[in-house]
Swiss-Prot record:
It is an enzyme of class 6 (ligase). Pfam families: AIRS (PF00586), AIRS_C (PF02769). It catalyses: 2-formamido-N(1)-(5-O-phospho-beta-D-ribosyl)acetamidine + ATP = 5-amino-1-(5-phospho-beta-D-ribosyl)imidazole + ADP + phosphate + H(+). Its main location: cytoplasm. GO terms for biological process: 'de novo' IMP biosynthetic process; adenine biosynthetic process. Its EC number is 6.3.3.1. The keyword ATP-binding applies. One of its GO terms (molecular function) is ATP binding. SUPFAM superfamilies: PurM C-terminal domain-like, PurM N-terminal domain-like. Gene3D superfamilies: PurM-like C-terminal domain, PurM-like, N-terminal domain. This is Phosphoribosylformylglycinamidine cyclo-ligase. Belongs to the AIR synthase family. The gene is purM. It comes from Halalkalibacterium halodurans (strain ATCC BAA-125 / DSM 18197 / FERM 7344 / JCM 9153 / C-125) (Bacillus halodurans).
């Protein structure tokens, strides 16, 4: 390698080592439709092997946001990749698409092979949970752009669905019920507010033992985002799902309307599902309003599902058979917007 390039802060040999270390993680995500191996200029996937009549490709890209800063502080890098995958695949499965493959982008100030491997391990873990192949990626060492202990992670997911099976929300009508699938915690949104309230304003540390949580604060906050792919795909086989929404940035107020036809809204019954204690801890510590909480956080619901009232019992049973819980958390209304009923003030 070029000594001059290394003196400029780019260690190509470290990059080669990182690639070698990540191979075993990439290989465990393989699907039979993947063509070629690690190291090609582009990842290849044989779409014809799916035997679809009218395949529609659905794609999504996302990152992890400032949750990364907690990983830096805790020097724990093996779960943040799950978050990157979850944010992408949960977005495309709500259209009815099965995630097929994933690509990652890691930018760092210094290429540390063990750290890169830990990140990719998490990405591979997420891909396994979603059933998609990790077919490519980029690791960019960018001295001067990032501190040596810092990095950013983004991902790109592509899935496919038969055109006739696209979930568009077009058939949703007033009176339909909204089911909620529980989240694993804060997921990957709202961390700038979390850090401000808990770490900066009130002096908690990531090592603080929080009695209400039964664990250290950092352990709770770094809990990976739940991946709903397998539950959703199995539930879609009922043919009864009218709409789906991934509750991410913007909370209920922004994400629930995204699945509804124009002119319709939703009434959400706060108290109809168990809210994880982390949200009460954030709310009480920061003295936040219901509007603040529901427009920033998932509040314990990571995925919303719309079904008719007649179909709700059958769909709930199907969800439960996948090992997931489901709660009736509200209903569709004939007035646009989201109303949170029974919420704290």
């Amino acid at each position: 390698m070029s000594d001059a390039y290394k003196q400029a802060g780019v260690d190509i040999e470290a990059g080669y080592e990182a690639v070698a270390r990540m191979k075993k993680h990439v290989l465990r995500t393989a699907r039979p439709e993947v063509i070629g191996g690690l190291g090609s200029f582009g990842g290849m996937f044989d779409l014809s092997a799916l035997n679809m009549k009218e395949p529609v490709l659905v794609s999504g890209t996302d990152g992890v946001g400032t949750k990364l800063m907690l990983a830096f502080q805790m020097n724990k890098h093996d779960t943040i990749g799950v978050d990157a995958v979850a944010m992408c695949v949960n977005d495309i499965v709500v259209q009815g698409a099965e995630p097929l493959y994933f690509l990652d982008y890691i930018a760092c100030g210094k290429s540390e092979p063990a750290r890169i491997e830990a990140i990719v391990k998490g990405i591979a873990d997420g891909c396994e949970q979603a059933g998609c192949a990790l077919i490519g990626g980029e690791t960019a060492e960018m001295p001067g752009m990032y501190d040596e202990t810092e990095y950013d992670v983004a991902g790109f997911a592509v899935g496919a669905v038969e055109k006739a099976d696209l979930v568009t929300g077009a058939d949703i009508e007033s009176g339909d019920l909204i089911l909620g699938l529980p989240s694993s915690g804060v997921h990957s949104n709202g961390f700038s507010l979390v850090r401000k309230i808990l770490l900066h304003d009130h002096g908690y540390t990531l090592d603080s033992e929080i009695p209400a949580l039964g664990k250290k604060l950092g352990e709770e906050l770094l809990t990976p985002t739940k991946i709903y792919v397998k539950t959703v795909l199995q539930t879609l086989k009922t043919g009864k799902v009218k709409g789906l929404s991934h509750i991410t940035g913007g909370g209920f107020y922004e994400n629930v309307p995204r699945m509804l036809p124009e002119g319709l809204g939703a009434e959400i019954d706060y108290g109809s599902w168990p809210v994880p204690p982390i949200f009460s801890f954030i709310r009480e510590t920061g003295q936040l309003s219901a509007k603040d909480m529901f427009s920033t956080f998932n509040m314990g619901i990571g995925m919303a599902v719309v079904v008719s009232s007649d179909d709700a019992p059958h769909v709930i049973r199907q969800i439960q058979e996948t090992g997931e819980d489901a709660y009736i958390i509200g209903r569709v209304t004939d007035t646009s917007g989201v109303v949170i009923g029974g919420a704290f003030e």
